[in-house]
């Protein structure tokens, strides 16, 4: 652990803010996709997209809280631009790519935290990486269904309810854990 405590803390705050910016982008991207899927009458897909966006909101808040605990200022800037007007198959392919890149980045951020001796933030990244992995698996599964079954799968989803209710907890907390 090279460097003084303030330098180590600054490095952790830096990666936390990078992660927060990634989460803020994901929130905007996934909510835009939620609205698009809902407009196309793919309610079940829209509802799950909203739940995943809620997970990302929780992640952004968790990062902000940790940044504040360390004496930093949470960023309000999102990383990247929101892509609009995507076809349904493209949504799931691009979101899987985004989640994969997020997992890779967070794994690097986790290493930084461990190198700086911040086990609390390292544990936060470990927990969030697990949730991002659940999102990746979901996007890959839906993408595979769309690729293999095409319009047949989408017809099955068309007309399904999109409401997630007012007490939505997010995708990870709403999905039963694998036993």
Curated annotation (Swiss-Prot):
One of its GO terms (biological process) is intracellular iron ion homeostasis. Keywords: Heme, Iron, Iron storage, Metal-binding, Oxidoreductase. Fe cation 2 binds at residues 56, 99, 132, 135. It is an enzyme of class 1 (oxidoreductase). Gene3D superfamilies: 1.20.1260.10. GO terms for cellular component: cytosol. InterPro entries: Bacterioferritin, Ferritin-like, Ferritin-like_diiron, Ferritin-like_SF, Ferritin_DPS_dom. Its EC number is 1.16.3.1. Binds 1 Fe-coproporphyrin III group per dimer. Binds 2 iron ions per subunit. It catalyses: 4 Fe(2+) + O2 + 4 H(+) = 4 Fe(3+) + 2 H2O; Fe(2+)(in) = Fe(2+)(out). Fe cation 1 binds at residues 23, 56, 59, 132. Its cofactor is Fe-coproporphyrin III; Fe cation. Pfam families: Ferritin. One of its GO terms (molecular function) is ferric iron binding. Fe-coproporphyrin III binds at residue 57. Residues 1-150 form the Ferritin-like diiron domain. Transmembrane segments: none annotated. Iron-storage protein, whose ferroxidase center binds Fe(2+), oxidizes it using dioxygen to Fe(3+), and participates in the subsequent Fe(3+) oxide mineral core formation within the central cavity of the BFR protein shell. The catalytic dinuclear iron-binding site within each subunit is known as the ferroxidase center. Homooligomer of 24 subunits, arranged as 12 dimers, that are packed together to form an approximately spherical molecule with a central cavity, in which large amounts of iron can be deposited. Belongs to the bacterioferritin family. This is Bacterioferritin. It comes from Desulfovibrio desulfuricans (strain ATCC 27774 / DSM 6949 / MB).
